[in-house]
A protein has these predicted regions:
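Zn-dependent metallopeptidase/amidohydrolase metal-coordination segment
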Residues: 206-207, 211-275
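Acidic, glycine-rich active-site loops and adjacent beta-strand->loop/helix elements
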Residues: 48-60, 80-83, 209, 239
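A common structural junction motif
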Residues: 174-180, 272
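Active-site metal-coordination/substrate-binding segment of hydrolases
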Residues: 1-47, 52, 248-251, 255-260
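Active-site-adjacent substrate-binding region
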Residues: 116-131, 139-140, 179, 188-236
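Midchain, well-structured core segments that form catalytic/ion-binding scaffolds
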Residues: 56-170
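Buried hydrophobic packing segments
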Residues: 27-37, 66, 229, 265-269
Length: 278
């Protein structure tokens, strides 16, 4: 296992480091893309900004503050997902079931019956929803929490756009026994862009031109800054077949992919800033 905080490059040009894929490497690809545009003397009709977020994993507080003091961008992307361009993200919600310690028997029964024995798709709660664009509902991040004299259990949903979060909440409440409470700790509604609109079609065409691969827009089970920042779609950096790399030991990204990302992003910047998609 390579040290996470000191990049190591092997003889094949593969770089190992925490964040090389998610997202420090792709951020540098965006910077080099903008630098290349400047060095080539390409004129842009619109200004370009790169925002460095630091709170994407724990609540988006950075962008919430940004949006209080600045206007959102006209359009853009976050390099925090995969290729081709992602036109829709699932919703994300986290729930907490709680009760007094003396109700631990009822609490344990609920957790065992509806959460721990679930197949990961919400079937025990009657939430095994599926649609053609997003696929199946997913349940994850199950954990016991200490609430200072009360029992608590958190669990999260990654849900398709065909179900609303208030429907999820009503369904959970219908399963509760006396003495149990449930609350939605946070929710981020699904993100949905017109896959035939200018932004998605421009990024689709750019990806296809640079890579020669199919750029048909896709959906994702993940969540990115697109949840909170208007007019932003997930776009890169992972290429088809590259899965389960980020947040794991030996996170990696090939030097050639960093360069390829920079090429994709450079052409994308020029086309979006100048209102071109061809």
């Amino acid at each position: 296992i390579h040290p996470p905080f000191s990049a190591y490059e092997d003889e094949n040009g593969r770089i190992f480091a925490r964040g090389i894929l998610d997202n420090k490497g792709p951020t540098l690809s965006c910077l080099y893309a903008l630098y290349a545009i400047k060095k080539l003397g390409i004129q842009l009709k619109r200004p370009v900004h790169i925002l460095f977020g630091t709170n994407e994993e724990t609540g988006f507080e950075d962008l919430k503050h940004f949006l209080k003091v600045r206007k959102p961008p006209i359009m853009g992307w976050t390099p925090d997902c995969k290729y081709p361009v992602v036109y829709a993200e699932r919703g994300r919600s986290t729930y907490r079931v709680s009760t007094a310690i003396e109700n631990k028997t009822v609490f344990n029964q609920f957790i065992n019956e509806y959460i721990l024995s679930d197949n990961g798709f919400g079937n025990k709660l009657g939430l095994n929803i599926e649609d053609l664009e997003f696929g199946k509902m997913q349940m994850s991040n199950k954990k016991l929490v200490d609430l200072e004299g009360k029992l608590g259990f958190d669990f999260s949903f990654s849900y398709p756009a065909s179900i609303r979060n208030d429907t999820i909440e009503r369904t959970i409440k219908s399963k509760l026994s006396k003495g149990l409470q449930v609350e939605c700790i946070h929710n981020y509604d699904p993100v949905y862009f017109d896959k035939n609109g200018f932004l998605c079609q421009t990024l689709k065409a750019t990806y296809e031109k640079v890579t020669g691969m199919d750029g048909t827009p896709v959906t994702t089970t993940g969540g990115t800054y697109a949840k909170i920042m208007p007019n932003i779609v997930p776009f890169g950096p992972s290429f088809p077949g590259q899965k389960g790399i980020g947040h794991n030991p030996n996170e990696w990204m090939d030097r050639s992919d960093l360069i390829l990302n920079a090429k994709i992003y450079a052409l994308s910047i020029v086309r979006l800033a100048n209102g071109e998609n061809d």
